[in-house]
Amino acid sequence: MPELPEVEYTARQLRGAIVGATISEALVFWERTIDHPDVPNFLAEIADRRILDVRRRGKFLIIDLDGEVLLTIHRRMTGNLLLLPPGWEIDTNLKTTDPVAWNIKGPSFRPWNTEDTTNAAATDLFYCRVCFNLVDGRRLLFIDTRKFGRIGLWPSKREQEALEGLGLEPFSDEFTVEALAKALAGRKGAIKQVLLDQGVIAGLGNIYADEALYYAAIHPLRHANSLTPDEIQRLYEGIISVLTLGIEHGGTSFSEYRDLWGEAGDNYNHVRVYHQQGKPCDRCGTPIERIVLGQRSTHFCPTCQKLT
């Protein structure tokens, strides 16, 4: 699942690429992707909207549009945004020739001139659930193989409702050591699981929680309310450090994540424990271990991150 760095990196790319552009229309190929409002109203309200800004809150992308409305995009497990240059055509023949395949793959996209592609996308693209056509001929695709991603269109005044339940925002003025200590106080659960709770810290996921705990030398099974002030200070610094590194390296691509141009992020070359089981810890040389916690893989150094 794309986490804060992947979403932030995409937001920055989008900000440079589409702010000022106008959405002529949206095409919806999997209706459940639209979670607000219903699809007919979504299609009617999105047409002819100019893009004013692109932001992020937690794992949500927010696209501000004229007319005081905004798009929210949550990519969930496998959602990606891909910006295509003018000249890419849609083939919907599969809908009538093979409805079963259509239900899985959706339409195909291909450039009219297959020898002149300007991004890293494959010649034929599938799994598009929503397509935003821009007036200048470009297409912004929401590609989601597993169909868990969700898109909403909201009045700007209802932004808080659209993003309800999100916790502290890293990099904001509100995210301080004191705020983190307060958020962890009274929580008896394993610190790894607490960090994954979007109501505590918005944007952290499996990759960066593992990396932050390693940075802070805290075992992932420690009770959250057992952390000392020094450990909370290190954890705060670790969260900021690993998220910053992830953004600088374009996000982490172990499987599905790609950026706006279809490129994989490079941060997988810089992780220290995530998916590194069996490899030596870069601090002490002990092999990194993997356990399952809350049905998620968790990676740590048993020497540097002691449970007791």
Describe the residue ranges of each PLM region.
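Structured catalytic/nucleic-acid-binding cores of DNA maintenance enzymes
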Residues: 1-308
